[in-house]
Amino acid sequence: LENKAEHDALTGLLNRQSASMRMANALERTLQRGYRGAFAIIDLDDFKQVNDRYGHLSGDTVLADVAQHLCGAFRKGDLICRWGGDEFVVYCEDMERDDIERRLVELSEGPWNATLPDNRVIELSVSTGIAMVPQDGIAFKTVYERADRALYRAKSKGKAHFCFFEADKDS
């Protein structure tokens, strides 16, 4: 029962409430241990069109596929959650900028395929905003807001882009 309360029923990932608490604790550990970390908001490109064109059952299939794809792109101990809708949040404790960048290049390099319930195959891509810890903040609210601003800039560039928070561009 506790597992159901902490996880998103559709994707099996941590849900927003559970992830918020765990990420706040992980951010505190990052500060205490002198680590660096990466906080990313990942948004599925054109997800509304999937629901509108293929139906909500297909949209659910796509979200579950994205969750699996994200689990394969990050380390086992990284916190990955479905934040809501087609938005996912990831916190990678003890990760340098070049490592998260490498993972995001792989994630963004091309669309990947998802098979819908009717066996049609569609291409998926994601856009991502990243805030680095501690340089972009330590408090959960701060890193979330900064990653969100970076995501907005990434989406303004088109599909399958990622951007790191930059104070001069994202303020």
Where does each model-flagged region fall?
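Residues at alpha-helix boundaries and short interhelical turns
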Residues: 34, 74, 115-118, 137
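A structural signal for short, well-ordered beta-strand segments
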Residues: 39, 88, 126-130
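Short aromatic/basic micro-patch
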Residues: 13, 41, 123-125
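Cyclic nucleotide signaling catalytic output domains
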Residues: 80, 120, 127-157, 163-171
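Conserved long alpha-helical elements within nucleotide-processing catalytic cores of c-di-GMP signaling
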Residues: 2-6, 12-38, 45-75, 81-85, ...
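Catalytic core regions of nucleotide second-messenger enzymes
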Residues: 82, 97, 109-127, 155
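Residue-level signal for pocket-adjacent positions within structured domains
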Residues: 5-8, 45, 49, 109-111, ...
